[in-house]
Amino acid sequence: MKTGAGTHGFFGIYKQGKIVDEEADKFVAAKSKSGVNYQYFKPVNKDDGKKHPLIIWFHGNGEGGYKDYQNNVSQKLANRGAVAFAEDKAQKIFGGAYVVAPQADDTWYNNYSKGYIKSVKAMIDEFASENNVDKNRIYIFGASAGGYMSFRMMIEYPDYFAAFSTSAAALDKAAISGGVATTAQDLMKIRNKPLWMVHAQNDPTISYENTSKRVYDVL
């Protein structure tokens, strides 16, 4: 190409290729027979003849679908909740674990009114039966609204899950946003279940005193 100054220059054409996220791309999108959209990861040693634990990750508010828009991807891209368990370090700790991240059609606050409790349980049963899952080692993790969902799943099926962990579980918000109140009587059903709660005392969104601290005091 000759420029106005009489000199010669060159230019190239760049075409954007596929954007690669090595962590997120380890997951595969699926939909259960019960109608739940989810992403799943299978450990590299899944075919070693052994049973492996299953980790369920419940996303927070704002990472579900919205009306007719269901992307089945926000729950793994919004934060490193699910993808962190697919890391080599985490996989080594668990000896190779399956990871499943379901996505609510809207919000987990509607877990009873829209039947998410039962449909998600059916999804877990289906996935576990189709893979080499150790049904004695199914763990729940959840953040914010997903923490609320984690509590409700554990309360409804206390003998099904081995343990659970929550980060700023939105028990207070759920009770006024379409969900149900988690009572002391509810919590007594899971009194002997292993639980690890993570919550900042100065959390400006989810009250530490009204949620994690209250649960700790009851249990």
Regions found by a protein language model. Give the residues of each.
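The conserved beta1-alpha1 loop
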Residues: 53, 58-60, 168, 199-200
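Loop/turn elements at helix/coil->beta-strand transitions in domains of secreted/extracellular proteins
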Residues: 50-55, 94-98, 129, 134-139, ...
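Active-site machinery of serine-nucleophile hydrolases
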Residues: 54, 58-119
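A domain-start/cap signature at the N-terminus of enzymes
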Residues: 1-53, 215
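Gly/Ser-rich "nucleophile elbow"/oxyanion-hole loop immediately N-terminal to the catalytic nucleophile
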Residues: 46-50, 108-144
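The feature captures the conserved acid-bearing segment of alpha/beta-hydrolase catalytic domains
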Residues: 162-219
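Short glycine-enriched nucleophile-adjacent loop
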Residues: 147-158
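Short, solvent-exposed loop/turn and secondary-structure capping segments
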Residues: 50-51, 65-73, 111-114, 152-153, ...
